[in-house]
UniProtKB/Swiss-Prot annotation:
Compartment list: Secreted
Any Gene Ontology CC annotation: extracellular region
Organism from which the protein derives: Dictyostelium discoideum
Glycan attachment sites: N87, N172, N239, N240, N250, N299, N343, N412, N419, N436, N468, N509, N535
Similarity-based family: Belongs to the beta-lactamase family.
Keyword Transmembrane helix: no
Protein name as annotated: Beta-lactamase-like protein 4
The keyword Transmembrane is annotated on this UniProt entry: no
Length: 569
């Protein structure tokens, strides 16, 4: 029987090697590790190689891990067409164009959290009644345009504001003119039914947010720009970031247009009413501060009343997808594009911008607390601006180092625990456990693993097997489990002290397409064991105020409830 179980579980758990992706816990690691230094050097060489191949003359790159800038570099000259030009630096300004939408989305969530707008699903005309547009749809709710629809490109609006770009910010493209033109136009689709990228939508979103402030408490001439400057730029120390080109004209690196090897500098157009969709000028250094903020790494140092403080739930919304695109491997969020990286089995969240010789991309790998901002100051066809290739270099290295750091932590904890423990009884067992696939410190469990090992069945043919502990890799010291042929690993429940009969199991043999539907890379369930004492009495841990005194030697596992089924040992 044991031989049969061994062969069965050997086959079942072989697919742990080809399982749903799991991600190590981001912790501080030595940035001078040779593997990291090589990775950063490889990224440096990658950028230089790509620049040469694509004819890019100036470029900036910033990479953040957790709360630190770990790589930053400027390439080329401030102005390639000026033979006397100084080198480009991390503090020179450039246009980030549609990356501006990140700030507009941040503003939306903050005003919602502050109660300035009641709900993301409010009709924007409740706040901006001057906005009108025609609709072929008859039902009242089909004519609504909400904050959420604008932020996720599902509003049904056209892509562009009804003005020529060269007229932005002039007397030919004022708010009055724009609203008058829109009032004679129609929605191109029913809101929420179609993903259709819209610069107009984000400009309207920012202006509606400004109107909500004007209604409630602010009387500034331009409440959108004023609010973003004073509630995002200034608190984050983004002192060289602005909507006003005149403020930084002498510090701005011009964008270049490459026309078959002939380079020219397009004239700098204003944004005017369209600023919320693409009007920000920033620097590589300032964008590094934004990366740290959006990774949630500076919240602990901020007062909860700070204008730049972000609730964890708000950050989760900001980074959540809203609607799947037709290709099935990408989706729009508010505002990030979510793209699945098959190379690394994870989602990359990004927002790019492309305007007048500037092509920028901000990207996040949330499970690893990595953020990147790359900007080409020359027109280039790469919409991700080489960030995806850089991520392909970074992830294997960070994964290896973080996994090793986790194992080292366990070994150190085990050594410390062994040195400090003078006696060992049969009522406690030292186990190394994982919650959400990240290593945690040693835990002294009330229920030893040996008590759980065995075969559980019921009259419906369900079979639940628990074998012994693993001794390798990510699954170190966890129990191997099989339920109806599916491979699992058993972890401790977070409240194991109070509820020692509850355990967490993780499924590991799912296909990659299935894995894509699972947030954070793991598919977990909770299971509930029932124990009897030597007299056949069921132990009720919930009603035992002193379950520390339960004699493990006289306990027997009676049953387990897993995914709605009750199985008996």
């Amino acid at each position: 029987m044991k031989y049969y179980l061994y062969l069965f579980l050997l086959f079942t758990f072989a697919n742990l090697l080809y399982s749903c992706p799991t991600y190590p816990l981001p912790i501080k690691i030595d940035q001078n590790d040779p593997l990291l230094l090589k990775a950063y050097n490889d990224i440096d060489l990658l950028i230089q190689s790509k620049m040469k191949a694509d004819g890019v003359k100036s470029f900036v790159a910033t990479i953040v891990y957790m709360d630190k800038v770990v790589f930053s570099k400027a390439y080329g000259k401030l102005n390639y067409l000026d033979i006397n030009s100084p080198n480009l630096t991390l503090d020179h300004n450039f246009r980030i164009s549609s990356v501006t939408k990140v700030f507009t989305s941040l503003m939306m969530f903050k005003l919602r959290d502050q109660g300035i707008i009641n709900s993301l699903d409010d009709d924007i005309r409740d706040y901006f009644p001057k906005f009108k547009i025609k609709s072929i749809f008859k039902k009242k709710e089909e004519k609504f345009i909400t904050f959420r629809q604008l932020a996720s490109h599902q509003s049904g609006l056209s892509r562009e504001t009804p003005c020529h770009r060269n007229e932005f910010g002039t007397s030919n493209c004022t708010e009055k003119i724009i609203l008058a033109k829109l009032s004679k136009q129609f929605l191109i689709s029913k809101p929420t039914t179609l993903s259709h990228y819209s610069n107009l939508g984000y400009s309207l979103l920012g202006r509606t947010l400004g109107e909500s402030l004007r209604m409630k408490r602010m009387k500034e001439q331009e409440p959108y720009e004023y609010w973003v400057t004073n509630n995002i730029f200034k608190p984050l120390g983004m002192n060289n970031t602005t909507f006003n080109y005149e403020d930084i004209i002498n510090n701005t690196a011009p964008g270049l247009v490459n026309n078959n090897g002939k380079y020219s500098i397009p004239s700098m157009t204003k944004s005017g009413w369209n600023s919320p969709g693409g009007g920000v000028f920033s620097t590589a250094r300032d964008m590094g501060k934004l990366l740290i903020h959006l990774l949630g790494m500076n919240n602990n140092s901020l007062d909860i009343r700070s204008p730049s403080y972000l609730k964890e739930s708000t950050l989760n919304e900001l980074f959540s997808p809203s609607n799947l695109l037709n290709d099935g491997s990408a989706s729009y969020g508010m505002p990030f594009l979510h793209s699945y990286s098959t190379n690394n089995s994870l989602w990359i969240l990004s927002k790019n911008g492309d305007l007048q010789g500037y092509v920028s991309n901000i990207a996040f790998v949330k499970p690893y607390k990595l953020g990147l901002f790359f900007s080409s100051l020359t027109s280039v066809s790469s919409s991700d601006v080489y960030t995806n290739a850089a991520i392909d270099i970074l992830i294997p290295v960070y994964k290896k180092l973080l996994e090793q750091a986790a194992i080292d932590s366990v070994i150190n904890s085990t050594t410390t625990s062994s040195n400090s423990t003078t006696t060992t009884t049969t009522t406690t067992t030292t186990t190394t456990t994982t919650t959400n696939n990240t290593m945690e410190s040693i835990f002294i469990s009330k229920i030893p693993h040996s008590l759980l090992i065995g075969i559980y069945t019921n009259d419906y043919g369900n079979k639940f097997l628990i074998l012994n502990q693993t001794t390798y890799g990510d699954y170190l010291n966890r129990l191997l489990v099989s339920y109806n042929g599916a491979s699992l690993v058993l972890n401790k429940f977070e409240l194991d002290n109070e509820y020692p009969y509850i355990k967490r199991i993780s499924f590991y043999n799912e296909s990659i397409p299935t894995c894509r539907t699972i947030a954070s890379g793991s598919n977990d369930e909770l299971i509930y064991f029932t124990f009897k004492d030597i007299n056949g009495t069921i132990i009720d841990f919930n009603n035992n105020n002193n379950n520390q005194n339960i004699d493990i030697n006289n306990l027997f596992v009676y049953s387990v409830q897993i995914m709605g089924s009750l199985l008996f040992k």
